[in-house]
Amino acid sequence: MTNIRKSHPLIKIINSSFIDLPTPSSISSWWNFGSLLGTCLALQILTGLFLAMHYTSDTATAFNSVSHMCREVNYGWVLRYLHANGASMFFICLYMHVGRGIYYGSYMFKETWNTGVILLFTVMATAFMGYVLPWGQMSFWGATVITNLLSAIPYIGTDLVEWIWGGFSVDKATLTRFFAFHFLLPFIISALVMVHLLFLHETGSNNPTGMPSNTDMIPFHPYHTIKDMLGFFVMMLALLCLVLFSPDMLGDPDNYSPANPLSTPPHIKPEWYFLFAYAILRSIPNKLGGVLALVLSILILVIIPLLHTSKQRSMTFRPFSQCLFWLLVADLLTLTWIGGQPVEHPYVIIGQLASILYFLIIIVLMPLTSLMENHLLKW
């Protein structure tokens, strides 16, 4: 008699994806972030569902409903801070996952990579809309500033912004639709994750050497399930420490003041995980130029497979490319720091130089370095 996990129409899909899946034996802990992202998504959907039971998407009551949740709902504060800090963990895992893809050449699986970039955009949109919902000062002004960027689009810009707002400013209609989309998008993300995994399982996983590993495969369960569980416990420990000891560390104090259209906060800034893109936006004095740079700072990931000039897939045996990669990481950390600083000297010039370096590394320096490494190895 055939084992049920290999014969049942539904269970055999799970079996071939998570149990008997042939996996390279050499993949390191950098391959844990996919499962951690799945965990984060499940956590965000669960906590978000319970938060939505107590939230009201009306400008008059939104701020008070969040306050009520934290004060009067049993463990409401845990749910709220798990959701808010869970988003931070989500983005930490996302950026590490993308970084791993760039370092080890996983972008050569073009379909998997492109669905991943679409996922990144969707998660960013979801997080932005979620930040607007508590209807604090930074929620209101963040929504106003970021949506207003669309007015830079020639001819249709102003109409587009007013269409998104549902009026002539960020108001009740905006909050209601943002809540509707914030609730809907995680389920669309879940469907996109399925597509992402479908494409990944067509080719199988990459490995640190970047070479085919068809001759050295092991089953996903129990080896990698145990390894993923370690990552899960480390992440949950970090998240719980954040939630229980310093839940507001990554938030903005301005968001504890109710939204007031008549008083602008001294420094309008998004959540920390968008600061690098915000710094690139601010570093260009022209509005349309800034918006284009903002979009391109993420969209540039799509052309990374086209810029691959090396004969080797992974950076494991390419020391010059490794130096450039870590320079890119340092540059992104610098941009994140600059995004949180006021627009004054010397932060402006540092931001502009870091923005130029960001695009320069990806578009010019990495392909040229790869060609140089090919030449050094007589290829």
UniProtKB/Swiss-Prot annotation:
GO terms of molecular function: metal ion binding; ubiquinol-cytochrome-c reductase activity
A Pfam family per the record: Cytochrom_B_C
Subcellular localization, as worded in the UniProt entry: Mitochondrion inner membrane
Residues spanning the membrane: 33-53, 77-98, 113-133, 178-198, 226-246, 288-308, 320-340, 347-367
PANTHER family associated with the record: CYTOCHROME B
Cofactors (names): heme b
Chain sites annotated for binding a ubiquinone: 201
Protein known as: Cytochrome b
Miscellaneous note of the record: Heme 1 (or BL or b562) is low-potential and absorbs at about 562 nm, and heme 2 (or BH or b566) is high-potential and absorbs at about 566 nm.
GO term, biological process aspect, one: mitochondrial electron transport, ubiquinol to cytochrome c
Amino acids binding heme b b566: 97, 196
Positions contributing to heme b b562 binding: 83, 182
Cellular compartments per GO CC: mitochondrial inner membrane; respiratory chain complex III
InterPro entries (UniProt xref): Cyt_b/b6_C, Cyt_b/b6_C_sf, Cyt_b/b6_N, Cytb/b6-like_sf, Cytochrome_b, Cytochrome_b_C_euk/bac, Cytochrome_b_N_euk/bac, Di-haem_cyt_TM
Family per record: Belongs to the cytochrome b family.
